[in-house]
Design a protein with these regions (language model features):
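Short, small-residue-biased leader/transition segments that mark boundaries at the very start
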Residues: 1-2
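Sec-dependent N-terminal signal peptides of Gram-positive bacterial secreted proteins and lipoproteins
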Residues: 6-26
Length: 231
């Protein structure tokens, strides 16, 4: 069993048949169709993520969904995804999947890939690859790298994990900064959630905050569990 840690002191738009631009008084927004991703987004037939573009599209699909329970899996053979690059665009700031308007309730399988993010929410909460994991939400088999910054509830995998959400076989290399509190390598805050691994759980990113700072979880409550299966 291995634990490693490095610490330092609206408008709802529906899906279109094809991608397009919707314009209005507030400007324009690109709308991506679910059909652009391989798979149907169910647990049995998850969306297939082949790179950064697909991951950005998946995030947009989830945000436009009323249920936010879409599932996705990184394709076999994909070992690294850098979300700071999307097509010709570079140095992008990642928008966490799932937030206070609706937590993520699907299953995301990183399939062993390392995903680099630059999540900078500054004065806002819930920064990470995912913002808030809710009931039924599960993130598995992924390592986060890069940086995650916010006010409260900041982690590499997610800002918050609540209501029986699960983080399975995940690790973090990203530097975590909470300008307020609740900073953790995997999750800033966890309540009634479960962190589980078949081998080890690790954080090698620097974790900083003014209060409630932890290598894996900044603040835990409600019977949070950490389970490591041996043998």
């Amino acid at each position: 069993v291995l634990f490693r840690s490095k610490m330092a002191g609206g408008i709802l738009l529906g899906f279109l048949a094809v991608a397009g631009i919707v314009t209005g008084s507030q400007g324009s927004v690109t709308v991506y169709a679910a059909e652009e991703l391989q798979g149907s987004g169910t647990a049995e037939d998850p969306y297939v993520i082949t790179g950064s573009e697909d991951l950005w599209k998946f995030a947009e699909i989830v945000k436009a969904s009323s249920d936010r329970n879409e599932c996705a899996k990184v394709a076999d053979g994909v070992t690294e995804i850098d979300t700071t690059v999307r097509g010709e665009k570079k140095d992008l700031t990642w928008n966490p999947i799932g937030d206070s308007s609706g937590s993520y309730k699907g299953v995301f399988d990183g399939n062993g890939a390392e995903i680099t993010i630059h999540a900078d929410r500054s004065i806002n909460n819930n920064a990470g690859l995912f913002g808030i994991l809710g009931s039924g939400g599960e993130i598995r088999n992924v390592t986060t790298a890069g940086s995650s910054k916010g006010w409260d509830s900041v982690g590499g995998i997610c800002g918050q994990a609540c209501s029986d959400a699960k983080i399975v076989n995940c690790n973090n290399k990203a530097d975590i900064t909470a300008q307020g509190g609740q900073a953790g390598g995997l999750a800033g805050y966890a309540s009634s959630a479960q962190i589980e691994s078949d081998t080890s759980i690790s954080n090698t990113g620097a974790v900083t905050g003014t209060a409630n700072v932890g290598g894996l979880v900044g603040q835990a409550s409600g019977g949070m569990k950490v389970i490591v299966h041996e043998g």
